[in-house]
Amino acid sequence: MRPAELPPPDPDALVTSRRLLERIGAELAASGNWISFARYMELVLHEPGLGYYAAGSRKLGSSGDFVTAPELSPLFARTLARQVKEILEPGEAVLEFGAGSGALADVFLQEISVPYFVLETSPELKQRQEQRLGARVRWLDRLPQKFRGVMIANEALDAMPVHAVAWTCAGIVERGVCVDENQLAWSDRGAAGDVLLNAQKIPVEVPPSGRYESELALLARLWMRSLARILERGALLVVDYGFPEREYFHAQRSMGTLACHYRHHVHADPFYLPGLQDVTAHVDFSALARAAAEGGLDLLGYATQAQFLVNCGITEVLGKENPGDPARYLPAAAAAQKLLSPAEMGELFKVLAVGRGVTTSLCGFSNGDRRSAL
């Protein structure tokens, strides 16, 4: 879909977007009219009071821009809780990154009585979580120094800033952002530093067009290493859309994975209404697994969301709904279809588990474990 075909913003939202544009323009003016796309993504998503996750617009649900698995139905949280129960030892806790509306924690805590922590960067979402969850949850401003238990990152990594890179016949360039004719635009520079070093390690074949574009999630790798430092015992479960490296940098994916979400429409222009749309990139699960290994964590499993949920017993969870109550059963069955269908979330979404000191095999990966693909 082209931006011209998208629904118009309301006047107040447009004012916020224009203020953010001024903020971006000021940074560009102070930086020689070029910033990395990772920095641009940080600004449009997280700039205090103005960024997508830092301002007050509604993100989730029918009136927002996208719907996550916990929003669809309690099925996801109830099924995930089965895996978490298997990992947890007495006295341990759960830590969720980016808890959205609080739907996952709400249902999860009906299944398991456990200390539950949330690390949330969005003030608006934190307020919604507080209203929904109350005293059942504790909110953190930063990572704890040590942690024992299970950490959950459900659709948290896709919104972490990424560096945009292009492999060309002339070499590797970093795609940044500039102002051109009073409009935000892409601008190439020769890649350098960590961006160049990491891009050189990827066996990209430059197509006949002479250009292959993609993303490097360097921040996600740092995030993984930081979790490895604090995890004394337990596991991290990452649920997100993405691919192993071989598929991520496939020859047919020469335009990368960047996508923008605005009022349930997906398009490809990251410069449209800055601050009013979500800007995302798919997760490179191979890079994430390597970062975990570098931090001393064990790779516990990797599977499609559909396989993981089936292994954890989603059909049994659905079976607890009464088919004689269509008002409850039919929405639950429809949600299960969306969570499991290869045409919906079942195949594109993956589950990665890494950890330390977990000696039991995890039920979520008992069949269809794709660790060898990483």
Task: Show where each model-derived region lies.
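Rossmann-like AdoMet
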Residues: 1-147, 165, 255, 307, ...
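A short SAM/SAH-binding and catalytic strip from SAM-dependent methyltransferases
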Residues: 145-169, 214-218, 222, 230-237
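A mobile, often basic/glycine-rich helix-loop segment
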Residues: 152-201, 251-261
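Conserved RecA-like P-loop NTPase ATPase core
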Residues: 76, 151, 240
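Catalytic P-loop NTPase motifs of RecA-like helicase/translocase cores
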Residues: 125, 159-160, 245
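Acidic active-site catalytic centers that drive phospho-/nucleotidyl reactions
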Residues: 96, 120, 155-158, 240
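A residue-level signal for conserved active-site and pocket-lining positions in enzyme catalytic cores
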Residues: 44, 151, 288
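Long, Lys/Arg- and hydrophobic-enriched amphipathic alpha-helices
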Residues: 200-374
